[in-house]
């Protein structure tokens, strides 16, 4: 169980190169040429050969209409099939998108904490957040389109179409990023990683979505659910209907907000992410065990444990340690533990920033007996709150030009990102005592029984799929 290092080193080199050219928190110099409109596309956009006809629109069916549930096995198989067909340029484009998504994810993770959402823990999916922003970019016109591209840390030159992001290329690359995560190869008996993304477009009655916009979102995920319902008469009831719909369609035990929607909204854009991974070689320990929330408070939680060869190192200067646990051939779980619980905020600020991967060392794997809580993390946040914290409260507000979304400019209410992340022990039985091979070094005991940070990383594209902190395994984030 050893995560490979070549792809990681290449990614670190790319990020070091990029970071060295960074001005402040924003980046304006990397070409990202594979993500821009090319000259021929720009010629068609600027000089259409035929007269532009009014775009076709449709009114979403009512939310109570009968709907088939999401089939996660089908979604997984579609991702695997698409990933197996990726060509070299597709992989390069995926790596470019991953790099930008990581950087935007770090900034928004910081906003998530500053908005006060990190008190009980935190979780954020950079690709899902990035996909949400790019979806709005596709639905926007200037000046909003340029403002969104600037938020995405990609330079735009006024009047230069070839400096504009091609949103279709970006969404397709984000789907490739998902495919590279779940396509792990290996033996057929290996439990696959599952990641499903669903988008709900909830509209007020009478609001008509453009077919072209919805079809573009299918590049990101085929699990699209445009639905209409009354958002103004009883906002609390509207929220309850949306939550019931999501539970019925997905079966996921999400942390869905109970607050009422804004009465003047005509569009809610909600993204739901479900990740499920199996930690091979781990088993659940009997009973429950103490997890210290702070120096004086503990809770009793289920724990899992396993012994294997993992990369592990300790940073004595900054007082934290890192353990890398493979989740597949190319996916790795990074577990970051401060040596002192009170240092969690400081270590988080030090680690979860643009140069995260430069902190990752590459020591030889060693025998580790790792024990940690069984993780089932639910989190939800409103992107509008993060934009407000980032001093962009009106970016998706009433003045935003989002007329490529529907027949009229929508009034965007909540923009939710909801996440359910499950990491469970493998099914194989483990011996009650560790079998020590003659002459082999004794396994180092590493126990995460106090707050820690985590990230899930896929090495081929260099994507950080999840960033998070666990303050209390029993709390909903």
From Swiss-Prot:
InterPro entries: Angiotensinogen, Angiotensinogen_serpin_dom, Serpin_dom, Serpin_fam, Serpin_sf, Serpin_sf_1, Serpin_sf_2
PANTHER family, per the entry: ANGIOTENSINOGEN, SERINE PROTEASE INHIBITOR, SERPIN
Family under the similarity heading: Belongs to the serpin family.
Coiled coil location: none
GO annotation terms (biological process): adenylate cyclase-activating G protein-coupled receptor signaling pathway; aldosterone secretion; angiotensin-activated signaling pathway; angiotensin-mediated vasoconstriction involved in regulation of systemic arterial blood pressure; angiotensin-mediated vasodilation involved in regulation of systemic arterial blood pressure; astrocyte activation; blood vessel development; brain renin-angiotensin system
Gene Ontology molecular function: receptor ligand activity; serine-type endopeptidase inhibitor activity; type 1 angiotensin receptor binding; type 2 angiotensin receptor binding
Role this protein plays: Essential component of the renin-angiotensin system (RAS), a potent regulator of blood pressure, body fluid and electrolyte homeostasis.
Protein localization: Secreted
UniProt KW keywords: Disulfide bond, Glycoprotein, Secreted, Signal, Vasoactive, Vasoconstrictor
Taxonomic lineage of the native organism: Eukaryota, Metazoa, Chordata, Craniata, Vertebrata
Modification note: In response to low blood pressure, the enzyme renin/REN cleaves angiotensinogen to produce angiotensin-1. Angiotensin-1 is a substrate of ACE (angiotensin converting enzyme) that removes a dipeptide to yield the physiologically active peptide angiotensin-2. Angiotensin-1 and angiotensin-2 can be further processed to generate angiotensin-3, angiotensin-4. Angiotensin 1-9 is cleaved from angiotensin-1 by ACE2 and can be further processed by ACE to produce angiotensin 1-7, angiotensin 1-5 and angiotensin 1-4.
Domain of life: Eukaryota
Cleavable signal peptide: 1-24
Entry keyword Disulfide bond: yes
Glycosylation sites: 38, 319, 401
Disulfide bonds: 42-161
GO cellular component, one term: extracellular region
Protein name: Angiotensinogen
Chief place of localization: secreted
């Amino acid at each position: 169980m050893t995560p490979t290092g070549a792809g990681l080193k290449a990614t670190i080199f790319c990020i070091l190169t990029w970071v060295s050219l960074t001005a402040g928190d924003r980046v304006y110099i990397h070409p990202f040429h594979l993500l821009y409109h090319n000259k021929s596309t720009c010629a068609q956009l600027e000089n259409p050969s035929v007269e532009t006809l009014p775009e076709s629109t449709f009114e979403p069916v009512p939310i109570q209409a009968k709907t088939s549930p999401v089939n996660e096995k089908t979604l997984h198989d579609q991702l695997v099939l698409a990933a197996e067909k990726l060509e070299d340029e597709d992989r390069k484009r995926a790596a470019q998108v991953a790099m930008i998504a990581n950087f935007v994810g770090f900034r928004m993770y910081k906003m998530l904490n500053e908005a006060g959402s990190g008190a009980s823990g935190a979780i954020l999916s950079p690709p899902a957040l990035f996909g949400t922003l790019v979806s709005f970019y596709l639905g926007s016109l200037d000046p909003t389109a340029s403002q969104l591209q600037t938020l995405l840390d990609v330079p735009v030159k006024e009047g230069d179409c070839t400096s504009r992001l091609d949103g279709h290329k970006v969404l397709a690359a984000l789907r490739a990023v998902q495919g590279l995560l779940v396509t792990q190869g290996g033996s057929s008996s290996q439990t696959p990683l599952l990641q499903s993304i669903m988008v709900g477009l909830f509209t007020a009655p009478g609001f008509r979505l453009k077919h072209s916009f919805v079809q573009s979102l299918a590049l990101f995920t085929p699990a699209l659910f445009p639905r209409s319902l009354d958002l103004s008469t009883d906002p609390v009831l509207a929220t309850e209907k949306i939550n019931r719909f999501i539970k019925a369609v997905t079966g996921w035990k999400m942390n869905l907000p109970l607050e009422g929607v804004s009465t003047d909204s005509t569009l809610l854009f909600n993204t739901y992410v479900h990740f499920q991974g199996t930690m091979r070689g781990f088993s659940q320990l009997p009973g429950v065990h103490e997890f210290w929330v702070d120096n004086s408070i503990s809770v009793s939680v289920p724990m899992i444990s396993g012994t294997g060869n993992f990369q592990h190192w300790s940073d004595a200067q900054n007082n934290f340690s890192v353990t890398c646990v493979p989740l597949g051939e190319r996916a790795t779980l990074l577990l970051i533990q401060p040596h002192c619980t009170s240092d969690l905020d400081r270590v988080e600020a030090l680690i979860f920033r643009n140069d995260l991967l430069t902190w990752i060392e590459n020591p030889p794997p060693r025998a580790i007996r790792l024990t940690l809580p069984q993780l089932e993390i639910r989190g939800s946040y409103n992107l509008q709150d993060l934009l407000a914290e980032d001093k962009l409260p009106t970016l998706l507000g009433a003045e935003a030009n989002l007329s490529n979304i529907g027949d009229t400019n929508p009034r965007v209410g909540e923009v939710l990102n909801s996440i359910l992340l499950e990491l469970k022990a493998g099914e194989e039985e483990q011996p009650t005592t560790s079998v020590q091979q003659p002459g082999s070094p004794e396994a180092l005991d590493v126990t995460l029984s106090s707050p820690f940070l985590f990230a899930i990383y896929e090495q081929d594209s260099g994507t950080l799929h999840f960033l998070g902190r666990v303050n209390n395994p029993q709390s909903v984030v």
